[in-house]
């Protein structure tokens, strides 16, 4: 199992979340929105590993400098905070200097997509949104329905939610009172 920790300075829970990870010796910690050496060192101290979400080369370089164990390339089409680079170009760029494990995410939803990710050079294909609608998911039923009923036309790439660009569904933005003029 793993835990995702957003390490951006606006996340006031980082230290508390990290302490829980240490207490329970969480084997995999996924970080995003900042690469923090202290967090990596702490997770490594109990034998855990850290993978870091990246959308650009400079993010990968920073994560590599702090000693992460692998990178998650969050490419165009990924849900939530995501980049605009297509998977083919980003994986080629990152593999040109990075030799540790690479996970590819973004628009991966079936076996063909997984095979394509592996063919491009990813070590692992990462599907997230696809699993929100499984019966084991604790996601809100209205959220599950929104995903099922939405189309590609409902995906909005915007920074209006957190200040960091990401892909969000139009109905979720509208439910937050964020209308098209703010996208």
Label each region the model flagged:
Residues 87-103, 109-183:
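Conserved active-site-proximal phosphate/metal-binding subdomains
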Residues 53, 106-107:
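Conserved acidic functional residues
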Residues 1-101:
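Active-site entrance/lid segments in N-terminal catalytic domains of soluble metabolic enzymes
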């Amino acid at each position: 199992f793993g835990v995702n920790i957003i390490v951006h300075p606006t996340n006031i829970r980082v230290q508390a979340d990290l302490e829980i990870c240490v207490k329970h010796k969480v084997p995999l910690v996924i970080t995003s929105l900042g690469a923090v050496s202290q967090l990596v060192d702490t997770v490594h101290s109990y034998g855990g590993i850290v993978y870091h979400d990246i959308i650009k080369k400079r993010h990968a370089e920073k994560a590599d400098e702090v000693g992460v164990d692998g990178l998650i390339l969050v490419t165009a089409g990924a849900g939530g905070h995501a980049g605009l680079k297509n998977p083919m170009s980003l994986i080629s760029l990152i593999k040109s200097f990075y030799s540790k494990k690479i996970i590819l995410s973004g628009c991966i939803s079936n076996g063909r997509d997984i095979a394509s990710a592996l063919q491009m050079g990813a070590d692992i294909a990462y599907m997230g949104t696809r699993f929100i609608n499984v019966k084991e998911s604790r996601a809100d039923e209205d959220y599950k329905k929104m995903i099922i009923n939405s189309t590609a036309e409902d995906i909005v790439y915007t920074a209006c939610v957190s200040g960091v660009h990401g892909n969000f569904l139009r109905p979720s933005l509208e439910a937050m009172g964020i209308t098209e003029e703010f996208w």
